[in-house]
């Protein structure tokens, strides 16, 4: 082997080993850009079953809040004329690989994963949205922007992340962190039905606008996006 080639391989080896160790290698799936043409939305309620997610006395179990918000988002999106597939519609455990299978089984779709945040520092609060593929960035930014219209919201930004459900998605995919359960104010709000409906309104509105544009939203969607405050899950 020529010395120059050997030297290049030696230089590249640490980076390759690091990528293998962390799982943060290149995108594993070539993502198709359906960010403006999708007719299906896969709505993912984070955690579930034996996996509580974050569990704080202010906000309760994350798996309960995510399921409620995801149910509301799904209802509003269906009213807009979009097809919706939920990764779970009850308190059951769904592995990350199963979630990936569900999202990738759809065609001409986008994926929206609902989560709540957690921190050891109770003062930390705010919304943040994550994406992995470049063609997911616009939807992530749109959702984050809509969440910022909620009173007293704090913008923690839009970030690239290597989460499995984003990294392995065949279509545009985002993950939304709807505030910190560890924060007294946001954790308390996460238990409130009206506040969860606000979260669902903003997320659904962003998805509808991403697909149809703000000027093309149907009258039916306009009426329904801010309607029906009935809880989707009994959290008592």
Stretches with model-predicted labels:
Residues 1-236:
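Catalytic-site microenvironment of enzymes
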């Amino acid at each position: 082997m020529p010395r120059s080639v050997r030297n290049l391989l030696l230089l590249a080896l640490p980076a390759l080993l690091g990528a293998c160790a962390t799982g943060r290698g290149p995108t594993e799936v070539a993502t198709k850009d359906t960010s403006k043409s999708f007719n299906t939305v896969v709505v993912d309620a984070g955690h579930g079953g034996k996996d509580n997610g974050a569990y704080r006395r202010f906000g309760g179990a994350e798996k309960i809040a995510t399921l409620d918000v995801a149910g509301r988002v799904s209802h509003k999106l269906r009213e807009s004329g979009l097809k919706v597939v939920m990764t779970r519609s009850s308190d059951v455990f769904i592995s990350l690989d199963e979630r990936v299978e569900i999202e990738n089984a759809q065609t001409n779709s986008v994926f929206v994963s609902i989560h709540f945040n957690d921190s050891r520092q109770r003062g930390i609060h705010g919304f943040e949205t994550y994406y992995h593929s470049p063609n997911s960035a616009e939807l992530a930014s749109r959702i984050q922007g809509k969440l910022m219209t909620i009173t007293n919201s704090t913008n923690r930004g839009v970030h690239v992340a290597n989460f499995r459900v984003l990294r392995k998605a065949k279509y545009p995919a985002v993950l939304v962190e709807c505030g910190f359960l560890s924060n007294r104010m946001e954790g308390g709000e996460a238990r409130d039905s009206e506040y969860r409906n606000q979260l669902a309104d903003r997320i659904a509105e962003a998805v509808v606008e991403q697909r149809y544009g703000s000027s093309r939203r149907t009258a039916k969607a306009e009426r329904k996006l801010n309607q029906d405050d009935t809880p989707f899950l009994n959290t008592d």
